[in-house]
């Protein structure tokens, strides 16, 4: 029986696993029969795998370990050798720390050609691997498990899932255990006489601590459909998923059980997120990551984020989930068709992992009794499934859902490969689990919009709080008056404030607060509140803030997408010599920002969600830093698109005259 040629596609949870074999059954059958069937297919495709089972006939644990890998390898494939040269070169260049990822990508393309996309890459099924590769992997995995002092506190089940696997995703298959073992084992050897070394969390801590003491480079721009593989341990740079992969390779090479947790969709952003985890001998889950550089290992229950669902990636197929679905494979949404993950939301949310029940009265279309319904999270104007249940005829009940985010229910239309919403979207309170449905009403209102994305990640804005605008008649500002003290985080692109100073000043400036790095994008000083043209003068600032792309000259260049970033946390300022004394009647300032505020001249489109489906409402070109849309349905979720630039946008509600982002 020959296993089908790999089908190239991206699995949502592991982000890159592609299914190799699966002419298994038209309907998921029993757990044992599926496993045996896949095993027989793999052994028939690669007779050399039978030799591995014969080799370990007398070693029951190695025999079971070999079976564990064989029973799951038919679901995996990796990039063939030589297919990823350009991508590897981009990571290599980026790892130097001298270039942005975009610059590294451009350089790699000039040197190696354009990177191949996932459809262009040649794939190699794992069932076709050389038996010797698998034997070497098993031997090295057992070596570290049995030799490391903490190995006795790692169960065989944990060993199989989080030490033994020869790959993480769909990376090119290359040997890695021996190299990484000798490269990083010196970290462990320094603590070989420490009694705590028998605790796997202690071993994980000291390795992480050592790794965090050396430079590494993060970027949110790296998002490939192919995992980088063990080379990431040397390159030490990339996305949060790349950095997670790095720790998995290093930890498993040393015999430390380690895996990856995933937010399939962040509760307040349109992206997944990843971090590492370890389960100790007492069953306690600890989380950590190179991305979380400010701490080491922390207990799962203190994780603080808006996450909806947390999935634990695993090497083995979650057969308990496939058994419970009992559906034709093509009728299952791709996220859950081959689940190489398990839901561990409750480990993180504890008593804030709520059971949500959506009754028939909240459904917007007929759902058949027994039909599979998916609970989904927002991804711009689409929905991404993160859980499923069967509708019992009265309610759709979903367990272990974290709050602080928006959900919507949907069914999967297999014929058209799309989700059909069956409820209006609803929010869930983070602390109490209270549900509120957003159903567009006939009653309308006018809305004033200032941005298209929430303040998530806009830490620059807070750096203006306690900053001051000052006037002086001394070039050194030895004697100065405060014209304006910023007391709260700016909420729009251009904030205008009238000043009531009766004095005139030759020198004016913005002086950033302690820890603010002088961050500001634009500052304008006006003689009167009615003036529309700011005063001009010679730009001033500290000598060490004059160079680079973020110098103080940006503060007066008229562009809100450039900014000042002083090289030191304190002492940053930017000002003007007006040439003569002038009254200051108004100040307009723009915080350093990520360009998600409304910008004059850009074309925007407002979308409204009705019964779970997003529809365009109206378009408008901004004539200032705000937009006024009239006749918008009340109590509807909204989304603002900038058709002129950028991709960051997030759904929000309009409440008490303000945008409230979810």
Residue ranges: model-predicted function:
Residues 335-347, 421-448, 659-662:
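Extracellular beta-sheet/turn segments enriched in Thr/Pro/Gly and aliphatic residues
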Residues 30-43, 56, 190-207, 211, ...:
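Hydrophobic/aromatic-rich core segments of domains that either
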Residues 35, 40, 58-235:
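Secondary-structure boundary elements
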Residues 369-388, 469-480, 484-485, 594, ...:
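Short amphipathic beta-strand segments in non-cytosolic proteins
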Residues 440-495, 499-504, 515-586, 590-600, ...:
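Disordered, acidic Ser/Thr/Pro-rich linker "stalks" and the adjacent N-terminal cap
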Residues 343-346, 355-369, 455-461, 593:
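Structural motif
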Residues 394-408, 412-416, 502, 631-634:
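Short Pro-Gly-centered beta-turn/loop motif in secreted/extracellular proteins
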Residues 380-395, 618-622:
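Short, acidic Ser/Thr/Gly-rich low-complexity loop/linker segments typical of extracellular
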């Amino acid at each position: 029986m020959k296993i089908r040629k790999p089908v190239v596609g991206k699995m949502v949870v592991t982000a890159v696993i592609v299914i190799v074999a699966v002419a298994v059954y038209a309907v998921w059958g029993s757990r044992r029969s599926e496993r045996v069937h896949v095993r027989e297919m793999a052994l028939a495709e690669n007779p050399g795998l039978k030799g591995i089972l014969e080799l370990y006939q007398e070693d029951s644990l190695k025999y079971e370990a070999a079976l564990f890998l064989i029973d799951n390898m038919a679901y995996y494939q990796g990039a063939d050798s030589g297919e990823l040269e350009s991508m590897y070169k981009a990571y290599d260049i980026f790892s130097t720390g001298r270039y942005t990822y975009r610059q590294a990508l451009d350089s790699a393309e000039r040197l190696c050609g354009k990177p191949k996309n996932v459809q262009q890459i040649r794939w190699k099924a794992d069932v076709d691997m050389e038996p010797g590769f698998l034997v070497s992997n098993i031997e090295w995995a057992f070596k570290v498990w049995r030799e490391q002092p903490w190995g006795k506190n790692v169960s065989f089940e944990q060993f199989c899932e989080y030490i033994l696997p020869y790959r993480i995703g769909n990376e090119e298959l290359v040997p890695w255990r021996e190299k990484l073992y000798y490269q990083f084992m010196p970290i462990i050897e320094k603590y070989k006489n420490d009694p705590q070394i028998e605790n796997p969390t202690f071993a994980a801590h000291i390795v992480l601590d050592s790794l965090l003491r050396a430079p590494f480079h993060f970027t949110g721009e790296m998002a490939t459909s192919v995992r980088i593989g063990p080379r990431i341990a040397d390159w030490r740079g990339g996305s949060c998923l790349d950095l997670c992969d790095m720790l998995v390779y290093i930890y498993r090479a040393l015999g430390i059980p380690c895996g990856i947790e995933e937010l399939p969709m962040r509760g307040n952003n349109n992206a997944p997120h990843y971090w590492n985890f370890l389960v100790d001998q007492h069953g306690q889950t600890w989380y950590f990551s190179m991305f979380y550089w400010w701490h080491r290992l922390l207990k799962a229950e203190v994780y603080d984020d808006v996450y909806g669902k947390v999935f634990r990636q695993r090497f083995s197929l979650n057969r308990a989930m496939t058994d419970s679905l009992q559906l034709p494979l093509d009728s299952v949404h791709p996220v859950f068709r081959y689940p190489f993950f398990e839901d561990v939301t409750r480990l993180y949310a504890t008593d804030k992992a709520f059971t949500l029940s959506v009754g028939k009265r909240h459904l917007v279309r007929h759902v058949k009794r027994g039909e599979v319904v998916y609970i989904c999270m927002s991804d711009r104007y689409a929905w991404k499934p993160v859980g499923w249940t069967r509708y019992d005829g009265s309610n759709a009940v979903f367990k272990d859902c974290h709050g602080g985010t928006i959900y919507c229910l949907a069914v999967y239309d297999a014929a058209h490969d799309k989700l059909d919403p069956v409820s209006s979207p609803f929010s869930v309170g983070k602390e109490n689990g209270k549900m509120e449905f957003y159903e567009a009403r006939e009653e309308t209102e006018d809305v004033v919009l200032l941005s298209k994305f929430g303040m998530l990640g806009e830490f620059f804005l807070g750096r203006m709080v306690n900053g001051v605008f000052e006037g002086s008649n001394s070039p050194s500002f030895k004697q100065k008056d405060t014209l304006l003290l910023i007391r709260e985080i700016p909420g729009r692109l251009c904030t205008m404030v009238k000043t009531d100073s009766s004095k005139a000043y030759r020198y004016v400036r913005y002086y950033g607060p302690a820890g603010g790095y002088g961050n500001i994008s634009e500052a304008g000083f006006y003689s009167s509140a009615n003036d529309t043209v700011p005063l001009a003068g010679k730009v001033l600032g500290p000598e060490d803030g004059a160079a680079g792309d973020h110098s103080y000259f940006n503060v007066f260049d008229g562009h809100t997408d450039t900014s000042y970033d002083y090289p030191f946390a304190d002492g940053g300022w930017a000002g003007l010599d007006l040439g003569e004394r002038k009254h200051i009647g108004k100040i307009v300032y723009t915080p350093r920002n990520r360009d998600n505020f409304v910008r004059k001249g850009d074309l925007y489109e407002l979308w409204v969600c009705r019964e779970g489906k997003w529809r365009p409402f109206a378009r408008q070109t901004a004539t200032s830093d705000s937009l006024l849309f009239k006749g918008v349905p009340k109590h509807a979720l909204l989304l603002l698109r900038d058709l002129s630039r950028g991709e960051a946008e997030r759904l929000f509600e309009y409440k008490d005259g303000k945008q409230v982002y979810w």
